[in-house]
């Protein structure tokens, strides 16, 4: 696949099809940082849903210069992968974001958009073809950039006060069985026992501290009340690890 990068007046070849048995195509997005990034900066994979009424409108937005948004890849409903921005350039997909001590995940991540109307336009299950393609693409990227399991995140993990994607229908548990991302291994009986316990202020604070330890940011938007922000963080955690509560 050839990327004709008008901004930097160069051509980059990324032949995914030789590394993966999946269909890929190219649809150039002009929305990325002009400066090429070092491979060592790529430590995260961020999953998103497109959150638009139609797939075509999502593709148009990701490739329109006025939108000032992009991702490295988009996975269509039929499982076909569109390459939008080369991995070696910073795409504009994370926005205001934070994880652990990092503020601004764009520079350090690969962004993958998955076609889905999202919560505003009729959120639906992701198709089997989409997930199959996502698994193959993720394995390729994990191997190439040595991405750790705990560095595979959703947009809502790094921007809990702003984003809900990829949402509670995203199959994190299924992906973890393919060595993509984390999932708790605690016994279900123990989980039920713990969940039946009443939570007091002390245990609530301990729970929040553990979320911050995992990586959820203490960063606070000055316009958002602290307690409200904490609720956003808890909801982000639940969307991923306890989706049945959402």
Model-derived features: where do they sit?
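Extracellular LysM carbohydrate-binding repeats and other cell-envelope/extracellular binding modules
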Residues: 243-246
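Short basic-aromatic helix/loop recognition motifs at nucleic-acid
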Residues: 224-226
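Short hydrophobic targeting helices and cationic amphipathic motifs
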Residues: 4-5, 14-16
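Basic/polar, cationic surfaces and motifs that engage anionic cell-wall
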Residues: 118, 123-220, 232, 236-239
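Active-site-adjacent loop/helix surface patches within enzyme catalytic domains
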Residues: 19-150
């Amino acid at each position: 696949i050839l990327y004709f990068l008008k901004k930097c007046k160069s051509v980059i070849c990324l032949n995914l099809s030789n590394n993966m048995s999946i269909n890929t195509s190219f649809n150039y997005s002009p929305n990325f940082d002009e400066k090429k990034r070092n491979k060592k900066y790529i430590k995260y994979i961020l999953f998103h849903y497109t959150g638009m009424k139609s797939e075509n409108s999502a593709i148009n937005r990701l490739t329109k210069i006025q939108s000032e948004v992009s991702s490295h890849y988009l996975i269509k409903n039929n499982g076909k992968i569109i390459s939008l921005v080369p991995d070696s350039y910073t795409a504009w997909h994370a926005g205001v974001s934070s994880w652990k001590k990092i503020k601004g995940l764009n520079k350090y991540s690969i962004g993958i958009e998955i076609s889905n109307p999202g919560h505003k336009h009729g959120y639906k299950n992701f198709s089997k073809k989409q997930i199959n393609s996502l698994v193959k693409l993720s394995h390729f990227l994990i191997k190439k950039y040595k991405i750790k399991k705990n560095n595979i995140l959703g947009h809502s993990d790094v921007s809990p006060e702003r984003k809900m994607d990829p949402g509670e229908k995203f199959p994190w548990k299924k992906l973890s069985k393919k060595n993509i991302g984390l999932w708790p291994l605690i016994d279900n009986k123990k989980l039920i026992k713990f969940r039946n316990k009443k939570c007091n202020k002390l245990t609530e604070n301990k729970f929040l501290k553990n979320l911050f330890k995992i990586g959820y940011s203490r960063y606070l938007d000055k316009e958002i009340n602290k307690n409200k922000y904490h609720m956003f963080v808890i909801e982000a955690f639940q969307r991923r690890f306890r989706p049945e509560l959402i």
